[in-house]
Amino acid sequence: ALISSRLGLEFKSQLDIVAAALLHDVGGLMIPGNIRRKRKADITEDDEKKISQCYQNSYIAFKDNTDLSPDIKRILSASIAVLHPDIPAASAKMPTVIGAEILKVAYNFDNMTAMKFGDEPLSEIAAVRYLLEHVDEFDKKVVDALLNSINILSPGVCVEFTNGDNGLVVTANDSNVLEPFVLSFKDNKLYNLGDSAVARSMQIKDIMKTMDNRHVVDSDLLKQYTGKTINMG
C-alpha cells in the first residue's frame, strides 16, 4: 500500500493491489509445513514442484471466482506470471502491469529480510542493494518508492562501514539511499558517501543492530562482591 501510494496511484488501485497480494499469499499458506520448515539450500526439485502447485491451485480457484473484480484478477494473474513463471497457467506472455511490478519488489524484499526456518535473513541494506543492482529485473521507479516508504538510513541511524569502522547517518540522500552524509566514530569526521573518491574506501555495509552499552567488569573483582561497597583504590 505504501509503495503504491508513493507512486501516486489512485486509492482504488491501491486497494486492488493489496487484495491481490493477500490472495497471492493464500497459495503460500497451502505449502506443506515440512517444506516450509526446510532451509533454502535443502529445498529439492520435487519440493519446488509442490510449492508451484500450491500457488497454481490457489490462482486457478481465484481466477474462476466471479465475485472478484477484473482488476484484482488482472493484477493477481500478472503477479503469478512474474513471481512464478514456471506455473503453466501463468506462462503466457502478459503486458506489464504496475500492480504486479509492485508486488514483485515487495515480495522479494520481504522474502529476503523475513525470518525463516534455518536461514539467516538478509539485512535491509543487503536486500536494497540487491534490488538496486538488478535493474533489469526490478522496476527502478518501484524500488525507489519502496525506499521512500521504509526510510532505512534516516538521520540518527548507526551503521557499519566496509572498512570496518562504525558511524552515524547525519543527512539522508534522496538521490541514493545508500550514499548519505555520515559521521565516522573513528576520526569524528563527516563523509559524503555520494563522493566517488570517498566511496572507493568506504561504503555502508549494514545497519548496527544495537549500540553496545555493556561495561567490562574484572571477573576477580566481581567474585569479591557481597553486596557491600568495594574499595576500588
What are these regions (language model features)?
Residues 1-233:
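Histidine- and acidic-residue-rich, metal-dependent catalytic cores
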